[in-house]
Swiss-Prot record:
17q23 region is one of the most commonly amplified regions in breast cancer and therefore may harbor genes important for breast cancer development and progression. GO terms for molecular function: RNA binding. Residues 313-325 have a biased composition (Basic residues). The keyword Zinc does not apply. It comes from Homo sapiens. It holds the Pfam family DUF4042. Amplified in breast cancer cell lines MCF-7 and BT-474. This is HEAT repeat-containing protein 6. It comes from the Eukaryota. The modification Phosphothreonine is found at residue 618. The lineage of its organism: Eukaryota, Metazoa, Chordata, Craniata, Vertebrata.
């Protein structure tokens, strides 16, 4: 009922909607009574009091239906008039007017406007001060209705209500003798804490006052004078108050004791009234990775068997509808606890799942799974979202309590279930308000672990999922578990249980692995026992969340197999939501740590394995013959393209998803499919979309298996993109992009796919020809759906380059023309996707030497680089980087025609745009500096000689220097150092003589010695070793500064406060040693004294690191450091040879000292490795 929303119940924190537009024939009774009331004047006579009493009674008893035509302002005005007529010395009338305020505001769903609120608040507060205590409950109910969603307008009354001696603080105190008054006061506080979007919230001091008051109530035991139902309602109000503080007030729980105290009471009340369970909790839960003790004592069986456990399987629930007045939702909601018996499941129901039960999922055959989710429980209104507005789920199957003999017991269970639901929803708000790393400190308090032999399992969220009699509470618990699991991948990644050896203690990694295993076991148990379709959906979604985050590559096999085999029958379930969530779970399995050998085997199972007939509206799993055929095209047998390891077993999941997407369902749409389009012959849209998503995930993770269906999937994509539903079209385009990406990955040099296992190029050409002759071009030009256009652009950029060059010329031109045209789109999504696609095409071997195309692409990219959207500019900068990579590739080809024909003016324009982009956000800057480095490397002597280029070259190099030195993101500085190395590669630039030379070297030496990020240091050291001639390093002083900086960098190669940087130490030393040896091999006679001086001070340190450099293998860095020990040894020998060739002045000792240093290094290396080097010959020089 509408009244439930305001007082004492959980359903919604959303503001009450204003009544509908007035309907003339309705509300006449209210208007007549209102007119009579407004005609009265204050009068203390008994007849006047009697008349007011009668009018109030009539107003309360009036039948107000929805859309009664009563305006909110009329209600507010009437209440103000009523209060003016009632002096505060008339207790009975004050009580009656309080009932009127409470009744009208709730019944008519009115929020009092600010104009009248001030008067009414002042009146009710004064009434509490002046009237007898027996009236306080009604007055507080009126006050709760007034402040509902009006907290921001009550600021001036907050000190009087919530101050140290405030009314609500006193009346809600444990010392309050009347439990109903105490409960009503707490309810007022909870309503004050409700937030309204866009309105100011309670100030922080009042938030803290309310939070402590609610927490104290939850921590205090039930007083002897309070009955159980009132206690439950008190708990509900306190929980609702905390939930409102966390949701709307964005209250942050920063203190460990504060959070621990809240979690302790939430855990306690999650199990409130649960049959057969009574837990004692500590006052505070402290974060710990170890399981916490739950002092748990079973309740003695004082109740009958039917109430102490889940109802028996053959006993039917009685239900009678009793019309009752329900006040403000706090006395009673029209909802029972939802205790609805489980449908029989091969003789095993939830009633048998006692605490000591250790029933393993491995014992569950798929035949015992509930294929038909029918039963009374299916009508339960359990939504997939238990947000702050979800505690009100009233349905006809939960209407009232049973007859007199069990009515009180049933009512009690209903209120206890609401407390459990309230605690769970409050816990959900708590999870959202704290950081995940803080939450996971309490993992063991809420997540089950595997019990030791003979010891009971500690209570957890899974206890509720398995044993709570209310489907709504079970679904609430599952949603909380899902929220905990969401984003837990990093935390769970430490789990490891692949080894069986016993230890004297249980490592944290093993404990987490046990938790993951137990979650699988319990969730699969819950799935078998559950009869409510809505809760089944929640279980499957929770499993999907678990599967997405668990590290199966570090766990023992069979966990995924059990989930896989148990979920397969639910694909045929009668409820479409169950079917969709089942596909979501299968998608999670095929996407987690793909490819997993265990999943690969599961995908190759026979089609019929574990699937039963459930009279559902889903298609047959045995599709018509044309889907059973071997993958289409002359291709597959002739070109040896088959499923992995030569298996001829088709992938049943791909077959299933294809049939769901393209085949008509076999019978009429069931009631649960009502969400699908009227008269549709296909599966409901959510089902088809999920099937397309699973196909996309299969293409991403198991492409070797998916490619066998390439042409069939091409037909599926064409069908989807030809449909009217933009969502189906979009998912078809996503599948196309993933298939295209998979084909590209196969042809990459580092691909693990054997050449004979790749899809042959001619087959890929056939595939893309089908796409380009189909609905793809139409989707690219569908400006009404820009998201589809953008996705189609992404798909077009996933063409295999080898296949693109073999497409007919008209299809190639179509792709290029469409992309260049779409670059002018006004939609940012489309423009970003187009810019990226052009950045891919400029790398195609068949296009990169086409000067006209490269120039057109460059102009389009430069235009996008000036867009207002950061995303567009970021994509354009990436494409500009690719385009300049193409310039470098073309420069390295023997044919100079490209360089000669490429426009100098366009180069100038590109340099200016890249300089501007280097001042942009980091997303743009990182690729802008990359482009600058390539452009400066590409410049020819003919360009550099022109005066127009001199200034722009200087600006470009200054932009790079500035970026190297700036405190930008690591990727930006890394790219800037890389770009500087590219600049040094251009022999036409005046490196060594130009004024910017010293600035460039100083920037790099600063980075190599002091940058916090070791990858950036490595790249700067690599750049310092690029110049191939001594004169390019500049003066003797400059050379000495570079040498000394590298020696210092070697000394500081382990100095870091970030532990993660240590793994790059060896790579950094390798690169610095290479740079030092490079400098030795280029040094002139005037450079030697400085080198000698440094070696005298730090020679032992340098020698030890160079020896490590010579003896170590490849370090896996991409800086170009020689990988083989022989190459490294040769570098030192060449440096020694160069030293011997230097003509030093007579009496100079520096050359001899350095040669001795190098000879000693080679001698030590020779002794340790036994290599046959020609040391004597070099020494004699």
């Amino acid at each position: 009922m509408a009244a439930v929303q305001v007082v004492g119940s959980w359903p919604s924190v959303q503001p009450r909607e204003a009544p509908r537009e007035a309907i003339p024939e309705r509300g006449n009774g209210f208007r007549l009574l209102s007119a009579r009331l407004c005609a009265l004047r204050p009068d203390d006579s008994s007849s006047a009091r009697t008349e007011i009493h009668l009018l109030f009674d009539q107003l309360i008893s009036e039948n107000y239906s929805e859309g009664s035509g009563v305006a909110p302002e009329d209600v507010s005005a009437l209440l103000v008039q009523a209060c003016r007529l009632v002096p505060l010395n008339q207790n009975h009338l004050v009580s009656k007017v309080s009932q009127l305020i409470h009744h009208l505001l709730n019944r008519l769903q009115v929020i009092v406007d600010e104009q009248h609120l001030d008067f009414l608040l002042a009146y009710t507060i004064s009434a509490i001060h002046q009237c007898s205590s027996w009236t306080h409950r009604e007055i507080l109910q009126a006050l709760a209705a007034l402040v509902y969603c009006n907290g921001s307008k009550c600021q001036k009354y907050l000190p009087e209500l919530l101050g140290n001696t405030g009314l609500l603080m006193k009346l809600s105190d444990l010392a309050q003798s009347d439990p109903e008054v105490r409960r009503a006061a707490v309810h007022c506080m909870a309503n004050l804490c409700l937030s309204v979007p866009g309105q100011p919230y309670l100030e922080e001091p009042y938030q803290n006052v309310c939070f402590q008051a609610f927490l104290t109530i939850l921590q205090s035991p039930k007083s002897s004078d309070m009955d159980d139902i009132t206690f439950c309602m008190l708990l509900q109000n306190a929980l609702k108050g905390i939930q409102s503080l966390l949701n709307g007030g964005r209250m942050k729980l920063t203190q460990t004791d504060e959070l621990g105290a809240l979690l302790a009471v939430l855990k306690k009340f999650m199990f409130h009234g649960l049959p057969g369970l009574n837990i004692e909790m500590p006052t505070v839960l402290y974060p710990t990775p170890l399981p916490q003790y739950d002092g748990r004592t079973p309740i003695k069986p004082q109740q009958s068997e039917s109430s102490a456990s889940r109802p028996t399987l053959n006993k039917k629930k009685k239900s009678k509808v009793k019309p009752k007045k329900i006040q403000q939702g706090e006395e009673e909601e029209k909802e029972s606890s939802g205790e609805i018996e489980a449908a029989p499941v091969t003789g095993t129901g939830r009633v048998n799942l006692h605490e000591g039960n250790t029933w393993c999922p491995s014992s569950l055959g798929v035949q015992s799974l509930p294929l038909d989710g029918s039963g009374a429980a299916e009508k339960d209104g359990v939504s997939s979202s238990f947000s702050s507005s979800s505690w009100k789920r009233v349905s006809s199957s939960e209407s009232d309590f049973s007859d007199a003999e069990g009515g009180m017991q049933s009512k009690m269970r209903s209120y206890q279930a609401k407390v459990r639901q309230g605690a769970l929803v409050c816990f959900l708000s708590t999870i959202k308000s704290i950081e995940k790393k803080v939450l996971y400190g309490y993992w063991s308090a809420f997540i089950p672990d595997t019990p030791e032999l003979g010891s009971p399992q500690s209570v957890s969220l899974m206890t509720l999922t398995l044993k709570d009699p209310s489907p709504k509470t079970r679904a609430c618990a599952l949603q909380v578990l899902s929220a905990i699991l969401e984003g837990s991948k990093q935390f769970l990644s430490v789990a490891e249980d692949t080894s069986d050896h016993r230890r004297a203690f249980t490592p944290f990694s093993v404990m987490i692995a046990c938790s993951i295993r137990e979650l699988h076991r319990c969730l699969l148990l819950a799935l078998v026992a559950e009869s409510s379709s809505q809760t089944v959906t929640q279980i499957i979604k929770c499993l999907a969340n678990l599967v997405s985050n668990a590290p199966y590559d570090r766990l023992k096999l069979s966990l995924l197999t059990k989930v896989w085999n148990q979920i397969k029958p639910y694909i045929r379930h009668k409820d479409v939501n169950v079917r969709v969530s089942s596909l979501t779970l299968l998608g999670a399995i095929v996407s987690t740590h793909a490819p997993l050998p265990e999943v690969q085997l599961l995908l190759q199972q026979p089609c019929s394995s574990g699937l039963g007939n459930s009279n559902s509206a889903t298609p047959h799993l045995s599709p018509p013959d044309w889907w059973k055929k071997a993958p289409a095209g002359p291709s597959l047998e002739e070109t040896s393209v088959s499923s992995p390891k030569g298996s001829s077993e088709p992938c049943w999941l791909i077959r299933l998803c294809i049939s769901i997407v393209v085949l008509p369902k076999e019978d009429s749409c069931s009631g649960s499919d009502a969400g699908s389009a009227a008269g549709s012959t296909y599966e409901p849209s959510p089902m088809r979309l999920e099937a397309l998503q699973v196909l996309t995930l299969l293409a991403r993770g198991y492409f070797s298996m998916t490619q066998a269906y390439l042409m069939e999937l091409g037909e599926v994509i064409c069908k989807c993109m030809g449909e009217a539903d933009p969502s189906i079209q979009l998912h078809g385009a996503k599948l196309l992009e993933e298939l295209g990406t998979g084909l590209i990955q196969q042809y990459k040099p580092d691909s693990t796919a054997a050449p004979d296992q790749r899809a042959p190029v001619f087959l890929v050409v056939m595939f893309w020809t089908m796409m380009l002759n189909g609905p793809l071009p139409r989707a690219l030009q569908n400006s009404e759906h820009p998201t589809l256009q953008a996705s189609a652009c992404d798909a077009l950029s996933s063409i295999l380059p080898e296949a693109f060059s073999n497409l007919p010329n008209d299809r190639q031109m179509l792709c290029i023309t469409v992309l260049l045209g779409l670059n002018d789109s006004k939609n940012r999504l489309v423009k970003a996707a187009t810019s990226r696609a052009l950045g891919v095409y400029v790398l195609f071997p068949c296009l990169r030497q086409d000067v006209i195309f490269v120039a057109d692409a460059a102009n389009a990219i430069l235009m996008s680089l000036e867009d207002k959207s950061l995303n567009v500019r970021a994509k354009a900068a990436w494409s500009l980087g690719n385009l300049t990579d193409t310039l470098i590739v073309n420069m390295e080809t023997p044919d100079p025609s490209f360089q000669e024909e490429f426009s100098g003016l366009l180069l100038l324009k590109m340099l200016r745009s890249a300089i501007e982009a280097s001042k942009d956000k980091d997303k743009v800057k990182s690729n802008a500096v990359r482009a600058l480095g390539n452009l400066l490397h590409f410049l020819q002597p003919s360009h550099i000689e022109k005066p127009t280029f001199a200034e722009i070259i200087e600006e470009s190099i200054q932009a790079l220097i500035s970026t190297v030195l700036t405190e930008a993101a690591m990727k930006v500085r890394w790219n800037a150092c890389y770009a500087m190395g590219n600049v040094f590669k251009n022999p036409a630039l005046p490196l060594g003589t130009a004024p910017w030379t010293s600035q460039a070297y100083n920037a790099l030496t600063s980075v190599v010695t002091s940058c916090k990020n070791f990858k950036v240091r490595i790249r700067s050291a690599a750049a310092l070793s690029v110049p191939g001639k001594r004169e390019q390093y500049g003066s003797v002083d400059q050379y000495a500064r570079i040498w000394n900086a590298l020696v210092t960098a070697l000394q500081k190669s382990e100095d870091t406060i970030d532990f993660l940087e240590f793994k790059y130490c060896v790579s950094l030393r390798t690169q610095i040693c290479q740079a030092l040896i490079h400098l030795l091999s280029l040094a002139s006679a005037s450079d030697l004294p400085c080198m000698k001086e440094t070696l005298e001070l730090s020679g032992n340190m340098v020698q030890s690191y160079i020896l490590q450099f010579l003896k170590s293998g490849a370090e896996g860095d991409d800086t170009g450091a020689p990988h083989s020990p022989q190459e490294r040894d040769q570098m030192v020998r060449m440096a020694l040879k160069h030293m011997g060739s230097i003509q030093a002045p007579t009496g100079d000792t520096a050359r001899r000292a350095i040669m001795g240093f190098l000879e000693e290094i080679l001698a030590v290396c020779f002794d340790s490795s036994g290599s046959q080097g020609a040391l004597p010959g070099l020494t004699n020089q």
